């Protein structure tokens, strides 16, 4: 070394001036004192003091002796360490110590002294700090690089520094430590794994949480040395991740935590590590993939992370894990989504597609977390989620699992409240989620009580928060109601109705409890408890809890009084909240935090507590309406036109007047309503009248000034007002005034005298008014009414056609285009019906003669006089009026008894009327009467005829009505076990004999053994039986079989001696029996009870006669294939909020696009149904399949497609499909199959007349066949000759002995049913007008397209020729048959393709738009739609030559 030359040989130690020798002979205190002086000397020296350096060299060596390095006293050691640090500074760059071992001892000694830094409160701390500062500044430890044991020294130093750092240290300490450690990494040749571990261990979460300062120190060190240390970090991860050498470090198990920390510190540290993660994401080890996914979720989702944009391959690879096979991995990905959406909105687009798939994940937890992720992001900022993401939440509100549905509904509710109610993000955001309110209320259509209760809770807490101040709450409700769509409004009205009903049930229960206990009262209480239980979740538990609650009410008078106050009509909202609080407080038990009993009672109280509406609320609502009327409301700001707001406000008040009539009892409210009566807007005045009718019972006593102001207005309205206002004015007088007889007389007399048949315009209101007076006060005007009906109504109005109708080929026109004379005739028919319903007896035989008149109208197709003056649209209206009138009268027992079977059968044919709107409205009237249990069961049999309807929408609606009516009756029987005497009129299975009888008398069923006609019969029977047989409750299959067997032992009561008629009856029985046998495995069991057959329809069974003959032709056997009926789809959809019946579709070419879940087919041989089918007729392969039956030419299948000119006759109809098909067709169908691949495995095509034997090869025939038909249609289109007049009833079958071979191709479109919401019941007239309005709206879209189609059908020479030679003549529905003229050219026999048929085609093509994206399919699709169209010709009952332009 440099100093060796000047070393004294004697080794004498020179001490600084004033310092005596330091040895073990002196005391510790003295030693410390002397060492301090030495420290001072070294501190003051610098590197340039060569003399001093030489002078004190031996002292430097002496201080490094073991005596000092191992001295027991810490103060001595500290001072020596300070000296040594200065010595390294002074003698740098060469240290005075030559021995490597000595150097190691010295540095290990200094390292040990650094532990003293830990105690910042120590008096010696400054000296420790000096020591640290000195060695850091001088980089003294760098001397150790040359030592073999350098790694041990550095590792010890790092460990020491990381262990001593704490929050007592200031920034300088931290800085010096970083300087010291970074110099070792940056200037050294290598970083050992052990040294790296001492740094990285501080990043592991457990250590990080224990010593935050050590973590910060490691972080600062890594940032400072990033470039130098990166290769060593890369090597470490490479060894662990890629080579699996976990033994190289104790930190191997924390690699993923470390990667995250290192990435957060400096992403450059991991430049070479991240690609390794991509490899790990594809590992076969589930746990390993999960760890990597968790890690990357944090890295991608971190607030300022740019990893996704910097490393796109890794991001794409990560997104792939959303579809991982391992559930926890998918779950992790979904949870990550919300952080990613919140912190990186730019990645939302990438995530959307993956979240879409996961929102349909089979795992409930994943679907649930998709909702949570999207809603969490949306609640932070609605702009973070796009419409697609919100739609995923929307879809999940219909999830099969309650937990997912609940999360989705609550999520949407919270989003709605924040952005729509509180306008947290302005109007644009509110607009973006404007659909939420409608969607949430639509869920009220679900059958599940849990869903409905949640909707009620959401409405009360999020949509119209009950804790708002009254005025604010009513304003909120007012504008909500004005902006809801029609279905949501219906749902909200239904909600209030249900709550009101439950409130009354609880009130009845309380009344029963107060009565003295008897067996009868106990039974009544139990019955009432059962009814209330059905309105609560989990009926099993609810029943027990309700029994317990009933006991509490009997025992605890205070709770009973609170509940009485709660259900009282005068209960205010504030009072209601108080009552609920008191009852729950009394029932609660502090020792039992989770109390299921209390929870159930809370559900009940929530449903019955009037938290929104009381007298004060109604008053506030009326004021809000008045503001809109005066123009002082902020309607425009709320995005509602003033007229719409006023109308909606009155509608809202009208609904509330049903559920909360007492709340309207205030002078202010009635005065405002009186002002509304005088407004020009008819709807507003109409609603005001209805409100008076519902709420005015106390006006006469309590508000005389209102009474005197109201009476003249009512008189005026009933005489001169619009018809609907006249109707409600009469009902108001009846409800409000005690002197109603006088008032009625004052109105009736002048109206009666002024009736003038020549003044048609002014006849409608008087007829309406007189009709309603007759309904409400039949005895008061019995004589004048009878003569009025006989002379004026029948002779002057109905039997007279004063003006010729407009010539038109349309079958239906809007109200404003209907001739005034027809409008008067319709009101005349209604007036007669009201008169009869008021009388409720047939003593004067008025009912009999009226029914005769109505059936004559039906028989003459609406032209009662048969003079041919009435236009076709007017005839349609009159047929509808007559059919509806019979259905209305049938609801009154005294008239039901006198309706003959012939009249009933003729009325039934209205459901197959040639005019779509007649069928639609008649079906709705029928459903309304049935669902209220007013119509006898035989009227449900009429629904079977809907199987013949060519329009899917009508079939779907009929199917839903059937399901609903069967369910209603079964529920009623469950609830009223004691009504066994009514079993014959209520048990749905008893519809089977009526259906069999009706089908045996169907005018289309002419030839007993005709295969095509029998197939029709089978379709109609299956339409009813499929739903009845869906569940084999109480062995009902055997019961139905027994019923059918019994019918075969009787005769037709309508013509017991008519052999042909009885043979038809038995043949229909055999069809039914074959369906039952093919669809049930339990039909052969013993029937639970012996069925009773209706005596009006069947004679008593002949004990001596055993009818075991099989009446079916042998060929029919092949049309019955086994398979269980599946109606789950239909059952699930009955109450779904689908588009309302008759909803107009988007383009004029489409008539009835039903964007709802596909309902099943009505085919006994149908293998099942496609769930969630695409809206395309193209998907209904099997819908067009029944023309594959009974082929006389089974061998010609392949020829058919190759020669497009083959006649229809040659098209194969055999059920047995050829196994081989063209590759070309196969291709087309494969494309098609892709679209339904999810459904196909379930075997659920919607084939109506096809068994399981119907293989794909058959489906693959259709594209070519469609092309052929399409070409024919195009050719016919060009000819475009006018259609020839046809008959009403079903399409005539041309003359000739044989059966038409084309007929099978004419019956298919009836098959594809789509679910539709059964329309809610409304006021009769109101409902009819609304229905007619809807149908008009719709018909416009159809009129234009029909003519060409009708002509096309009329002009196909090949098909007509075939028919003319092979069809059976047939009677038109509703009147005697008129045979086609022999001279008439055969090609025109098929003329009147009905409107429904033509528009069916349009419908199909509209539905096809959905599939346009996939071009290989779409061409065939539209052809398939067209073919379906063609095929359905045979199903239209009534026909007209010129309906095409309707």
Swiss-Prot record:
Interacts with the cohesin complex. Interacts with RAD21; the interaction is direct. Interacts with WAPL (via FGF motifs) or CDCA5 (via the FGF motif); the interaction is direct, cohesin-dependent and competitive. Expressed in prostate. Residues 1421-1431 have a biased composition (Acidic residues). Residues 1172-1184, 1196-1212, 1223-1241, 1263-1272 have a biased composition (Basic and acidic residues). The modification Phosphoserine is found at residues 1140, 1162, 1166, 1176, 1182, 1191, 1255, 1257, 1281, 1356, 1364, 1367, 1381, 1415, 1418. PANTHER family: ANDROGEN INDUCED INHIBITOR OF PROLIFERATION AS3 / PDS5-RELATED, SISTER CHROMATID COHESION PROTEIN PDS5 HOMOLOG B. The modification N6-acetyllysine is found at residue 1136. The modification Phosphothreonine is found at residues 1253, 1365, 1368. One of its GO terms (biological process) is regulation of cell population proliferation. Belongs to the PDS5 family. Residues 1137-1155, 1353-1370 have a biased composition (Polar residues). Its main location: nucleus. InterPro entries: ARM-like (IPR011989), ARM-type_fold (IPR016024), Pds5 (IPR039776). Residues 1247-1259, 1285-1297, 1370-1382 bind DNA. The lineage of its organism: Eukaryota, Metazoa, Chordata, Craniata, Vertebrata. GO terms for molecular function: DNA binding. It comes from the Eukaryota. Gene3D superfamilies: Leucine-rich Repeat Variant (1.25.10.10). This is Sister chromatid cohesion protein PDS5 homolog B. Disulfide bonds: none annotated. CDD domains: PDS5 (cd19953). The gene is Pds5b. Keywords: Acetylation, Cell cycle, Cell division, Mitosis, Nucleus, Phosphoprotein, Repeat. Pfam families: PDS5. GO terms for cellular component: nucleus. Residues 1243-1252, 1308-1317, 1339-1351, 1436-1446 have a biased composition (Basic residues). It is found in: Nucleus. Residues 1137-1446 are annotated as: Disordered.
């Amino acid at each position: 070394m440099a100093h060796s030359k000047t070393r004294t040989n004697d080794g004498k130690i020179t001490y600084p001036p004033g310092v005596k020798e330091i040895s073990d002979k002196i005391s510790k205190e003295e030693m410390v004192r002397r060492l301090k002086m030495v420290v001072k000397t070294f501190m003051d020296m610098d590197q340039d003091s060569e003399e001093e350096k030489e002078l004190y060299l031996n002292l430097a060596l002496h201080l490094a002796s073991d005596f000092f390095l191992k001295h027991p006293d810490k103060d001595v050691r500290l001072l020596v360490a300070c000296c040594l640090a200065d010595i390294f500074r002074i003698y740098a760059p060469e240290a005075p110590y030559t021995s490597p071992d000595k150097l190691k001892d010295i540095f290990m000694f200094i390292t040990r002294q650094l532990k003293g830094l830990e105690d910042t409160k120590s008096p010696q701390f400054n000296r420790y700090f000096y020591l640290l500062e000195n060695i850091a500044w001088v980089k003294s430890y760098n001397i150790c690089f040359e030592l073999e044991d350098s790694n041990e020294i550095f590792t010890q130093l790092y460990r020491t520094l990381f262990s001593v750092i704490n929050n007592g240290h200031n920034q300088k300490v931290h800085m010096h430590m970083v300087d010291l450690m970074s110099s070792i990494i940056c200037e050294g040749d290598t970083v050992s794994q052990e040294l790296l571990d001492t740094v990285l261990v501080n990043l592991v979460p457990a250590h990080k949480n224990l010593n935050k300062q050590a973590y910060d120190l490691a972080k600062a060190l890594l940032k400072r040395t990033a470039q130098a240390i990166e290769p060593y970090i890369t090597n470490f991860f490479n060894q662990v991740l890629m080579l699996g050498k976990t033994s190289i470090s104790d930190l191997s198990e924390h690699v993923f935590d470390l990667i995250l920390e290192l990435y957060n510190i400096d992403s450059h540290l991991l430049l070479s590590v991240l690609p390794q993660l991509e490899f790990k994401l594809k590992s076969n080890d589930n746990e390993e993939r999960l760890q990597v996914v968790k890690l990357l979720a944090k890295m991608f989702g971190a607030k300022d992370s740019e990893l996704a944009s910097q490393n796109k391959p890794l991001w794409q690879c990560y997104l792939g894990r959303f579809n991982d096979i391992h559930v926890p991995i998918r779950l992790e990905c979904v949870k990550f989504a919300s952080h990613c959406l919140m912190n990186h909105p730019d990645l939302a687009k990438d995530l959307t597609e993956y979240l879409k798939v996961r929102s349909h994940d089979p795992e409930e937890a994943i679907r649930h977390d998709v909702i949570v992720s999207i809603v969490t992001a949306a609640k932070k900022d609605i702009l973070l989620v796009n419409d697609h993401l919100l739609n995923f939440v929307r879809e999940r509100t219909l999830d099969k699992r309650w937990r997912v549905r609940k999360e989705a509904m609550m999520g949407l509710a919270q989003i709605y409240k924040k952005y729509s109610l509180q306008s947290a993000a302005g109007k644009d955001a509110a607009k973006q989620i404007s659909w939420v309110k409608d969607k949430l209320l639509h869920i009220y259509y679900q059958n599940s009580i849990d869903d409905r209760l949640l909707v009620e809770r959401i409405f009360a807490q999020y949509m119209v928060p009950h804790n708002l101040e009254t005025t604010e709450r009513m304003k909120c409700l007012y504008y909500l109601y004005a902006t809801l769509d029609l279905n949501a409004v219906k749902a909200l009205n239904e909600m209030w109705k249900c709550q009101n009903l439950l409130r009354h049930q609880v009130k009845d229960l309380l009344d029963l409890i107060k009565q003295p206990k008897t067996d009868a009262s106990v039974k009544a209480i139990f019955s009432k408890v059962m009814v209330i239980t059905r309105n609560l979740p989990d009926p099993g538990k609810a029943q027990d809890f309700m029994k317990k609650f009933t006991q509490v009410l009997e025992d605890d008078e205070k709770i009973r009084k609170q509940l009485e106050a709660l259900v009282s009509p005068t209960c205010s909202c504030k009072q209601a909240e108080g009552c609920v609080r008191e009852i729950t407080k009394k029932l609660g038990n502090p020792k039992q935090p989770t109390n299921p009993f209390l929870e159930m009672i809370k559900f009940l109280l929530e449903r019955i507590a009037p938290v929104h509406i009381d007298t004060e609320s109604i008053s506030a609502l009326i004021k809000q309406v008045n503001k809109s009327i005066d123009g002082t409301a902020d309607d425009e700001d709320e995005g509602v036109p003033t007229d719409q707001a006023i109308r909606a406000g009155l509608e809202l008040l009208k609904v509330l007047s049903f559920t909360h009539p007492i709340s309207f009892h205030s002078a202010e409210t009635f005065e405002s309503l009186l002002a509304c009566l005088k407004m020009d807007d008819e709807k507003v005045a109409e609603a005001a009248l209805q409100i008076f009718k519902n709420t005015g019972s106390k006006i006469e006593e309590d508000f005389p000034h209102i009474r005197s102001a109201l009476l003249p207005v009512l008189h005026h309205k009933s005489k001169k007002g619009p018809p609907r206002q006249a109707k409600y004015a009469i009902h108001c007088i009846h409800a409000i005034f005690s002197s109603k007889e006088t008032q009625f007389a004052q109105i009736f007399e002048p109206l009666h005298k002024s009736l003038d048949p020549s003044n048609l315009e002014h006849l409608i209101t008087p007829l309406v008014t007189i009709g309603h007076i007759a309904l409400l006060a039949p005895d008061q005007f019995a004589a004048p009414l009878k003569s009025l009906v006989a002379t004026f109504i029948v002779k002057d109005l109905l039997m007279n056609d004063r003006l010729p109708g407009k010539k038109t080929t349309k079958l239906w026109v809007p109200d404003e285009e209907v001739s005034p004379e027809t409008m008067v005739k319709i009101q005349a028919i209604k007036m007669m019906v009201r008169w009869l319903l008021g009388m409720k007896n047939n003593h004067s035989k008025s009912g009999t003669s009226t029914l005769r008149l109505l059936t004559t109208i039906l028989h003459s197709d609406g032209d009662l006089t048969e003079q041919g003056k009435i236009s076709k649209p007017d005839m349609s209206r009159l047929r509808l009026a007559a059919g509806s009138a019979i259905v209305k009268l049938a609801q009154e027992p005294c008239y039901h008894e006198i309706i003959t079977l012939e009249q009933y059968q003729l009325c039934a044919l209205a459901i197959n009327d040639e005019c779509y709107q007649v069928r639609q409205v008649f079906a709705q009237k029928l459903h309304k009467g049935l669902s209220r249990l007013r119509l006898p069961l035989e009227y449900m049999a009429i629904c079977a005829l809907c199987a013949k309807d060519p329009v899917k929408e009508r079939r779907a609606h009929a199917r839903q009505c059937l399901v609903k009516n069967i369910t209603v009756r079964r529920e009623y029987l469950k609830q009223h076990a004691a009504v066994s005497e009514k079993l014959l009129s209520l048990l749905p299975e008893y519809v089977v004999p009526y259906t069999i009888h009706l089908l045996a008398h169907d005018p289309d069923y002419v030839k007993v053994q005709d295969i095509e006609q029998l197939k029709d019969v089978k379709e109609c029977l299956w339409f009813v039986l499929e739903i009845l047989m869906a569940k084999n409750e109480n062995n009902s299959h055997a019961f139905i079989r027994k019923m059918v067997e019994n019918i075969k032992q009787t005769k037709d009561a309508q013509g017991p001696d008519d052999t042909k008629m009885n043979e038809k009856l038995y043949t229909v029985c055999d069809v039914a029996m074959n369906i039952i046998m093919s669809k049930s495995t339990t039909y052969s069991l013993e029937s639970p009870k012996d069925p009773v057959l209706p005596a009006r329809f069947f004679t008593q069974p002949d004990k001596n006669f055993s009818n075991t003959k099989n009446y079916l032709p042998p060929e029919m056997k092949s049309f019955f294939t086994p398979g269980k009926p599946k109606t789950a789809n239909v059952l699930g959809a009955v109450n779904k909020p689908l588009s309302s019946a008759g909803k107009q579709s988007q383009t004029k070419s489409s008539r009835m696009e039903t964007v709802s879940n596909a309902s099943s087919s009505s085919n006994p041989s149908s293998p099942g149904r496609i769930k969630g089918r695409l809206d395309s007729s193209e998907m209904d392969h099997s819908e067009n399949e029944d023309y594959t039956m009974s082929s006389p030419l089974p061998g010609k299948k392949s020829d058919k497609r190759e020669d497009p000119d083959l006649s229809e006759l040659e098209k194969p109809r055999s059920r047995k499909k050829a196994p081989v098909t063209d590759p070309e067709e196969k291709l087309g169908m494969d494309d098609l199959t892709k679209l339904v691949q999810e459904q196909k495995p379930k075997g659920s095509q919607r084939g109506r007349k096809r068994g399981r034997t119907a293989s794909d090869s058959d489906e693959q025939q259709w594209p070519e066949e469609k092309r052929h038909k399409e070409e024919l249609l195009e050719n016919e289109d060009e000819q475009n000759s006018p259609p020839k007049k046809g008959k009403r009833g079903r399409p005539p079958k041309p003359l000739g002995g044989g059966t038409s071979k084309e007929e099978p191709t004419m019956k298919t479109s009836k098959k594809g049913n789509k679910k539709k919401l059964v329309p809610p019941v409304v006021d009769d007239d109101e409902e009819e007008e609304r229905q007619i309005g809807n149908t008009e709206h719709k018909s416009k879209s159809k009129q234009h397209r029909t003519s060409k189609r009708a002509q096309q059908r009329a002009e196909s020479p090949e098909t007509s020729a075939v028919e003319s030679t092979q069809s059976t003549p047939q009677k038109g529905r509703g009147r005697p048959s008129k045979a086609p003229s022999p001279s008439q050219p055969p090609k025109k026999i098929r003329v009147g393709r009905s409107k429904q048929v033509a528009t069916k085609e349009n419908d199909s093509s509209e539905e096809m738009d959905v599939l346009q994206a996939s071009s290989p399919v779409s061409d065939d699709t539209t052809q398939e739609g067209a073919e379906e169209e063609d095929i359905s010709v045979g199903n239209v009952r009534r026909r007209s030559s010129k309906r095409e332009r309707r």
